[in-house]
Structures are given as structure tokens and as C-alpha cells.
């Protein structure tokens, strides 16, 4: 029976969150086996199809179908309402130092925009990674550093307004730049050094977008930001 309890899951390790967008979970093997798995509503089907048992399913339960055959060990948290998305409902209840999301990119564009809106509205500073078939992206607040192959694409997307004071390792430096949607963004840059550093000024945070093959490097950077290195 679904619960409406809103007691958060307080975790000391990263969490894996699976959404309902099509995904083969490529890259999930890079996550440690002890990281707990959560499902956002219909993401339950993807998790079970890949032999992953979520600790909990969170959402408005409009996409999960019949629940009576589920393992009773899976907690069902039913949150009604259309004023927030299942992704937002999950992030509000999963208090982990890092969240790695699969199944939130690559399907409907309006859903992807809703995901970015949620990341822009978060008040905390934890890194959040989203894994897609072609891209991986990470929400960042503050400075960050990456160890990357030379000549790959490197994009920055502001979550509101974000300034940068200094950068290293990019073909087109973002030193002194203030990014804002509709005015200035930082897509389609290129890595020219194996170490890329970004020193951020005041702002609302930003997304770092890389090719999907760079998930290992993105995870490494995220674990450092989450003080889990």
C-alpha cells in the first residue's frame, strides 16, 4: 500500500535515481554497488527490468501500473499534485551528497526542460549528474575541476544567472563572463588541456555538459565536490 509519509531518506553515500525516460542504464556499472537505488514513478519498470530493486518508488504513481505484485520491501511513497514533477518530488526526499540520475534525458523535450527547471530551483549545493545516451551533465554550484581527454566538447549552461572569474583548459576561456539564458551561454566549447578548471563567481549554478563517454571523469569530479573522494 503506498504511503504518503514525507520522511526524507538521509544518506551518507550517493544515490542512484531512475526515471521513466527510455534508458538502458549504460554507465550504471560505474556506480558503487552499495549506492541505494530509487525510482521516480515509472522508472520502477526500468529498474526491475534491469534486475535492480529500488529502496523506494516516489511520485504521483500515475505510471507504475499494478503495485500488488511488488516486493513488499520496496517502499511506495505516493505524492499527489501536479505543481511539481516526480523528479522534484524525489530530490526533495532523497537527502544524499550526490544523486546520479538515469532516465531523465533523451525523451520528451518538455520533460528535459522541466528537469532543468527543477535543478535551477534547488536551494542546496550538492552535485547532481544526469546520464543520457549521448550526453552526461552535472549540476554545479561553485568551483569545479575535471580531468578530461583533449579535444572533446565541453558545454556550460547557466541555471539562471552565473558568473565565472577564471577558467583553464578551454579553447574559449570564460574568464569574467556572466552567463544568462537569453543573453550568454557557453555551449560547444572545446577541451585543450587534460585539466579543466572553472572558478565561479556569484550565481545560481550551472550545468556542465559532456559526451556520455566522459561519465567516469564526471563522477570523479562529483565525488570530489561531495567530499566523498
Placement of each model-derived feature along the sequence:
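N-terminal nucleotide-binding beta1-loop-alpha1 segment
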Residues: 1-22
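Acidic/Gly/His-enriched mid-domain segments of enzyme catalytic cores or analogous surface patches
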Residues: 8, 31-33, 42-126, 131-133
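A short secondary-structure junction signal
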Residues: 27-29, 111-115, 140-143, 167-169
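Long, charged alpha-helical interface segments
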Residues: 140-229
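Structural motif
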Residues: 18-22, 104-106, 133, 210-212
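Class I SAM-dependent methyltransferase SAM-binding "motif I" and its flanking Rossmann-like core
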Residues: 120, 124-149, 154
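Short N-terminal binding/cap micro-motifs at the start of the first secondary-structure element
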Residues: 24-28, 46, 216-217
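Short, hydrophobic beta-strand segments that form beta-sheet elements in well-ordered domains
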Residues: 15-19, 36-41, 54-61, 208-209
Amino acid at each position: 500500500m503506498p504511503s504518503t509519509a514525507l520522511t526524507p531518506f538521509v544518506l551518507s553515500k550517493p544515490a542512484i535515481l531512475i526515471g521513466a525516460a527510455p534508458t538502458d542504464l549504460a554507465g550504471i556499472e560505474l556506480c558503487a554497488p552499495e549506492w541505494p537505488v530509487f525510482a521516480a514513478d515509472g522508472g520502477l519498470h526500468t529498474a526491475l527490468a534491469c534486475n535492480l530493486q529500488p529502496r523506494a518508488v516516489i511520485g504521483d504513481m500515475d505510471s507504475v501500473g499494478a503495485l500488488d505484485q511488488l516486493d513488499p520491501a520496496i517502499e511506495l511513497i505516493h505524492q499527489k499534485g501536479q505543481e511539481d514533477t516526480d523528479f522534484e518530488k524525489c530530490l526533495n526526499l532523497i537527502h544524499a551528497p550526490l544523486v546520479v540520475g538515469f532516465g531523465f534525458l533523451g525523451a520528451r523535450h518538455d520533460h528535459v526542460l522541466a528537469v532543468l527547471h527543477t535543478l535551477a530551483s534547488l536551494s542546496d549545493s550538492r552535485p547532481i549528474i544526469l546520464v543520457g545516451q549521448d550526453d552526461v551533465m552535472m549540476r554545479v554550484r561553485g568551483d569545479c575541476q575535471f580531468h578530461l581527454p583533449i579535444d572533446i566538447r565541453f558545454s556550460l549552461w547557466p541555471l539562471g544567472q552565473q558568473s565565472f572569474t577564471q577558467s583553464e583548459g578551454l579553447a574559449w576561456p570564460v574568464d569574467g563572463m556572466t552567463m544568462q539564458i537569453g543573453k550568454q551561454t557557453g555551449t560547444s566549447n572545446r577541451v585543450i588541456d587534460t585539466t579543466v578548471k572553472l572558478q565561479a563567481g556569484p550565481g545560481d549554478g550551472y550545468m556542465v555538459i559532456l559526451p556520455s563517454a566522459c561519465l567516469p571523469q564526471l563522477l570523479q569530479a562529483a565525488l570530489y565536490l561531495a567530499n566523498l573522494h
